[in-house]
Amino acid sequence: MKFGSALVAAVAAVAGVAAKDYGGVPGQPIQKSGKGAVFSGATNPQLDLQNPSNINGQPATDIGLVPNLKWSFSLSKTRMFHGGWIREQVISDLPASHDIAGAQVHLTKGGIRQMHWHRVAEWGYVYAGSILVFAVTEDGQYQIDKLTPGDIYYFPKGAAHSFQGIEDENEVLVAFDEGDFDKIGYLFPPYYSNINLQLSNAFNYRTTFQVAEWIAHTPQDVLAKNFNISTGGTFDKTKSNMLEIINSTTSTHNVTGPNGALMGNSSYTFHIRDAPEIQVPGGGGTIQIVDSKNFPISKTIACAIVRLKPGALRELHWHPTAEEWLYFHSGNARATVYVSGGLSRTFDFTAGDTGVFPDNAGHYIENVSEDEDLVYLELYKADRVADVSLSQWLALTPHDIAAAAINVPIDVIDKLKKDKQYIIQ
């Protein structure tokens, strides 16, 4: 059964996705071989077209039941405020993501992400507009820095921080080193010996602590004593309304303090100009790495910013240190994940998608577009970016052993490159 490329392009255009001809019928469970049949019941045509690897484009090498490893921010509930919005991907959205949760935070000009802190570390990547970052350490050191597209911040667990939008529209990818970011923690009363009584009488608390909420729940006479001010209703307008974003005007004030500003290895911010693009040996794109080697404070989240040329392949590899959490910024991708036990599954990704590859699972990522670069971020709950290349491993193993292991002629192994290619054109 043959179907013209014009049909492929037409139906893909309806869904707003890149056209790639996998054969069969686009958007239908009919493969090139003739296997399958049309959908006769309810279905979502746009989702079907965006995920050909589930239907007509499903590789024959996909075997077994592999859990869903993909989420789209477009499926997340958006919390809207005067001054911006937030939408998250947490473990209830993507249960396979144990290490990292993510969010998109949008601020209008002057919009402030409320002063707060977390019981986990927060990492952020600016991809639209620019922001002012404000932070204070337990030692009274402070930081005020302007971040523009590509720049990164990292706030350790418990660090006091906030940020404000500077341009008309500003947006940040935020990640936390805890997949179950919104989980409720418990403080157990010590006077119950029975665990059921402890659970029923536990005090719950969440991951984020907000300054305005804390002040609103503190007696005013205590606030007056703490801040050395009069008790004349100063904090009457401080509300416990959990506003994560508030509207304001762009800050023009500077700050000085006796313990000085955060600088050097202690800085909470990183400017992407300090991580030049690496032109990889494979010639298929570039990689920028930001981890504790060049951003020392970022001890629990490491990042690689990857750009693949049209048709390029992020080579077959795995990561020895952690799960890989992904955010796709632009373009269209295809990836097959091998999770051992003979199980593998292929996924399609587009801009705004997140994904996770299980700890040490083998995989590749391919740019399926013919004319658009693929740009995505790899994040790890680790202090460094690390991967093991399958091709390099085979090339650096005695060639007769490697050839026997995968049952290929030895000259196939002889031709493999001994340096890591990263991205292959």
Swiss-Prot record:
Mn(2+) 2 binds at residues 317, 319, 324, 363. Its EC number is 4.1.1.2. Residues 73-236, 270-414 form the Cupin type-1 domain. Residues 1-19 form the signal peptide. It comes from the Eukaryota. The active site is at residue 378. GO terms for cellular component: extracellular region. This is Oxalate decarboxylase ARB_02208.
